[in-house]
Design a protein with these regions (language model features):
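Short gly/ser/thr-rich secondary-structure transition/capping motifs
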Residues: 1-5
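N-terminal Rossmann-like FAD-binding beta1-loop-alpha1 element of flavoenzymes
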Residues: 18-42
């Protein structure tokens, strides 16, 4: 089964090297990283704010950024993640890491700070 559509002209609104779909944590950092490396980037987000499901649905924890190393909870994911966390911390929107279910290290944040 197939559908045939007539040919049509579609306007282009720009030319980009990288198009990132979704303005969640991964999308934000992917777009920023590509732009810093000289790419022309378009970040497409369906909501009127960034943050992905964290801000849209109230999932307000980053999981996987920290690990238990010799009894200490330490951040193990760095790079541009540090910049994101620093910006949220400057807005007083970041809490200390904590345990969920006794084994998952998570870092809670203020959803409003992620939208900025």
């Amino acid at each position: 089964m197939s559908i045939t559509e007539p040919a049509r002209q579609i306007p282009l609104y720009g030319e980009y090297d990288v198009v990132v779909l979704g303005g969640g944590p991964a999308g934000i950092l992917a777009a920023a990283s590509a732009a810093r490396n000289g790419a022309r980037v378009l970040l497409v987000e369906r909501y009127g704010f960034l943050g992905g499901m964290g801000t849209a649905a109230g999932v307000s924890n980053f999981c996987g950024l920290h690990a238990n190393i010799h009894g200490d909870i330490r951040q193990v994911v760095h790079g541009m993640t540090d910049e994101l966390l620093d910006r949220m911390r400057a807005l007083d929107g970041l809490n200390d890491p904590h345990l969920i279910l006794g084994k998952i290290h998570a870092q809670a944040y203020d959803i409003s700070a992620f939208k900025c």
